[in-house]
Amino acid sequence: MNKTSVLMVMVSVVLAGICGCGPEKTPQTGFLSDYSKLQEGANSSLRYINKDALGKYTGFIVDPIAARFLAGTKAVKAKSEGQLSEQDISDLANYLHSAIIKAISDAGYKIEYRSSPGIARIRVAITDLEKTNVALAAVPQARMLTGAGVGGAAMEAEIVDSMTGKQIAAVVETKAGSRVPFTGLSDWGGAKSAMDEWASRLRQRLDEAQSQR
């Protein structure tokens, strides 16, 4: 048996003992103002968007990112084992907040701080975090097979009218870290990759809303 075959066998054995490598259904924490309009999307996500309404807004208030970890989540387990600190959570929340601010600004919208007509509010909660297994994620064969060890994050988010609180869009999603480009060589690289993807999607939705004005 050559070295490549031996490595593949070793990787397969390791992967057999790992849970949660595939898409998971994200639990609902109660953070969103309304879950009733959510519909299933790709990768077990739940989504809702009123495209016509979204296009009417000219600016956004971005609330501080919350953390809502339910019992049994990977984040709770990591906290109990000393693998996830309050500083980690704060740093990741700030990272996501900055990514959202940039997405909004790059799309040509104003960042606002007071409720007023024509302004929407963005609310986001991180609902789970999975630390990157740096040793496993660094093995190319493991990444090719399943994306194992790349870490990730889960969130609930909504856009609501800043005056009425009416929900304009919402999403509930768990996302693994990216394999291309590879993000597995830092403890929270996978979680940040997921957040970057969420911010990128927000930018895309805002661009689409602008084009429909």
Task: Please tell me what each predicted stretch does.
Residues 93, 97-101, 105, 126, ...:
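Extracytoplasmic/secreted envelope proteins and their assembly/folding machinery
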Residues 1-9:
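Bacterial N-terminal signal peptides that target proteins for export
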Residues 59, 152-167, 201-213:
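Short secondary-structure transition/capping segments
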Residues 9-17:
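Bacterial N-terminal signal peptides
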Residues 81-85, 147-148, 163-205:
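Short secondary-structure boundary motifs at beta->alpha junctions and helix caps
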Residues 66-72, 129-131, 173-178:
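Short connector loops/turns at beta-strand edges and beta->alpha or beta->beta junctions
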Residues 102, 106-166, 177-184:
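Surface-exposed short loop/turn segments
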